Amino acid sequence: MPDAPCRNPAALHDRFRLRADGAGSHAEALRGLEVLRRHAVDFNVLTLVSSANQDRPEEVYEYLKAQGVLFHQYIECVEFDGDGRRRPYSPAPGKWGEFLCRLFDAWYPRAARRVSIRLFDSILSRLLTGVPTVCPMAGHCCNYFVVEHDGSIYPCDFHVRPELRLGNIRDTDFRSLWNSPLYRQWGDGKARIARTAPPAGSCRSAWATAPRTA
C-alpha cells in the first residue's frame, strides 16, 4: 500500500516540508492524494510526530479523517546531532507518549472499527494472538523489503545503505532474498543487541541510533 504525502493540516505540514524555493508543499501533497483517489488506489498515511504537531494529536487525527484517510501510521521523529543533542524538529521528551494517549482517546471507541491506526492495531494483535504487526514489537527485523526508485532492494526503509543492498527487482526474486544470508544476519541484529546490551532500554536505543539514510 503506498504512503500518501498529505499528513498534517497546512500550517503543520508546511512547518518543515518546504519546496526548494522555500514555499510550502501542502497543496502539492493534496494533489497527490487526489491522484491516488482518482485511480482508486488504496493508500496509507504515515505521520511523523515532530515538535510542530506534538501538542495537536486530535487536530491531526480529525484532519486526516476529514480527508477520507482510513489507514493511519504515526511515528516519532526523533533525531540527534553529532554531539547527542536533540534536533529542533524532534518532539520533546514525554510528548510522544502524551500524543499517543490523546490520539487513542480520540480514536476509541468512536472510530476504532472504521479507522485503522497501525500501532494500536499491532498492540491488539500482540495481546490477542501473540504476533505483532509492526517491526518494533517483534523480536527480529525480517518482515518486509524496500524497493527504491532504481529497483534496488533493501531490508528496511530505515536501513537503505550500500552494504545492505540485497539485489534489484529486475533480476532478483523475493523468495531468494527472503533466505539470503545478508538479510537474515541483518534481521537477527535486534536479538543480538538484546542479548548483549545492558538493560533499561539499551536494545531500543542501540537499534534506533544505528546509521541509516532513509
What is the predicted function of each stretch?
Residues 149:
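A cytosolic small-molecule/anion-sensing beta-strand core signal
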Residues 15-27, 34-136, 140, 146, ...:
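Radical SAM enzyme [4Fe-4S]-AdoMet core and its adjacent flexible, acidic
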Residues 7, 77, 205:
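Flexible loop residues that form catalytic
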Residues 2-3, 29-33:
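A conserved non-catalytic segment of reverse transcriptases
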Residues 160-214:
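Flexible mid-to-C-terminal extensions adjoining Fe-S/redox cofactors in radical SAM and related proteins
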Residues 1-13:
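Conserved SAM/AdoMet-binding glycine-rich loop
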